[in-house]
């Protein structure tokens, strides 16, 4: 599997954060295209930390993923919510904040110029 990130995000937030951020951004956009996982005016991505570690980021520990997600939420790059149908399911859902979307737009415009 190929993972990518932009150095601007990595410099500001960390490499693990940048890798996770771009993966979440990809899935949020895919969900938007297929009109899935909309709640409270946002389109969301969800997976447990364990699922993220086992399926897409097997080179990261669960603690690295947990810390990076917490950092991205605290840095206003991701919103975190719980929208599970089963009340006992405490899997977090993540979406991009307006700040994150603006940064992604700037990065994409920068890449389009090259």
Tell where the protein language model's regions lie, with residue ranges.
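Short recognition helix of helix-turn-helix/winged-helix DNA-binding domains
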Residues: 1-51, 98-105
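Residue-level recognition of short, structured coil/turn motifs
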Residues: 14, 57-61, 112
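Charged low-complexity intrinsically disordered patches
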Residues: 70, 98-114
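Winged helix-turn-helix DNA-binding recognition segment
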Residues: 31-92
């Amino acid at each position: 599997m190929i993972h990518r990130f932009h150095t601007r995000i990595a410099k500001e937030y960390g490499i693990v954060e940048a890798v996770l951020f771009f993966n979440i951004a990809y899935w949020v956009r895919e969900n938007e295209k297929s009109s899935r996982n909309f709640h409270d005016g946002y389109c969301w991505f969800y997976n447990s930390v364990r699922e993220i570690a086992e399926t897409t980021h097997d080179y990261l520990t669960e603690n690295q993923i947990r810390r990076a997600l917490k950092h991205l939420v605290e840095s206003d790059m991701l919103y975190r919510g719980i929208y599970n149908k089963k009340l006992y399911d405490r899997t977090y859902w993540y979406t991009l904040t307006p700040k994150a979307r603006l940064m992604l737009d700037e990065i994409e415009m920068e890449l389009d110029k090259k």
